[in-house]
Amino acid sequence: MGGCGSADSWVEAAPAQGWPAQYGDAANSSYTTTNGATNLTLRWTRSVKGSLAAGPALSARGYLALNGQTPAGCSLMEWQNDNNGRQRWCVRLVQGGGFAGPLFDGFDNLYVGQPGAIISFPPTQWTRWRQPVIGMPSTPRFLGHGRLLVSTHLGQLLVFDTRRGMVVGSPVDLVDGIDPTDATRGLADCAPARPGCPVAAAPAFSSVNGTVVVSVWQPGEPAAKLVGLKYHAEQLVREWTSDAVSAGVLASPVLSADGSTVYVNGRDHRLWALNAADGKAKWSAPLGFLAQTPPALTPHGLIVSGGGPDTALAAFRDAGDHAEGAWRRDDVTALSTASLAGTGVGYTVISGPNHDGTPGLSLLVFDPANGHTVNSYPLPGATGYPVGVSVGNDRRVVTATSDGQVYSFAP
């Protein structure tokens, strides 16, 4: 039995080498080491025949997964990104959790929540395992060593063994007085981040130091606060609660590459940096707009502001006790979180050009060093708002809208 040591770590589930989930990685950095393409061609478009509130997940093999909300028929879909969006399989999940996206592992298994359960699917549509949880899981996160972090909108945090689907350690409940039998309570408040949904956004995790950060809007409190936990020896332990952002935080937090700093939007129209060890404020910088999606972050410390209506596109550098403005584009309205690919390419979805009397949407390719436009590609017939940009390890770029339209570009 001595031969059964840690050499079998390759069989443990880990994030796919693509864009495994919304915001790219467990830290929510929206960054990939893949060098992004600047010249793209629109290869295919397709509709989920419903709505979307989370971005596409991309596996290393070119599979694409979407958690749609549809009036009938399939809602969770897996398509072939490199084959004109051809459907591989689809199933119908319990509806109401569209704000949470699926997660791919390196074996093309999928992990996704529905109200009251977390489910894993193999590369075919048959269920690998399904386990009950209290509430609706947000986009899951890998913790390393085949462990999965599941955080629900009602404040339950659990760690699962991805192979067997069993809970490891003890769950942590961040919100008191929750009815465990009502998995859908407050779900309608999650996408707009209103107080009825205590945990409206996915947590951030750093594998460097085991830090988990999640935003929690406790019942009866005026605003959402950040809560910090440590994952150690297969157990989550609550470490701190921060009210540094007194106006409340909005959207998922983002952890720096070294796990030392949390970046988050404030409802006070500022970008905040907090110490990940204790939740104390390091600095805040005025954005001049309300960012409704998380910032993006390179390993070298460039921070690109989140998106939303009436925004600009702005970048900062963390100078320790203050932020230095890197550049700002007031001429574009960034509607989604930027996705940063390698050293020299960023993507976001912006408003315009106008089309048939509607505002229209375009995929903007920009240089993160200075914000300059490299290319711009209109999204034909796009309506609603964008739900993010995903960058595959084959350099294909996929974006989608809240009205269920999916656009796939190739270099």
UniProtKB/Swiss-Prot annotation:
Gene3D superfamilies noted in UniProt: YVTN repeat-like/Quinoprotein amine dehydrogenase
Name of this chain's protein: Protein Rv3035
Signal peptide location: none
Protein origin, superkingdom: Bacteria
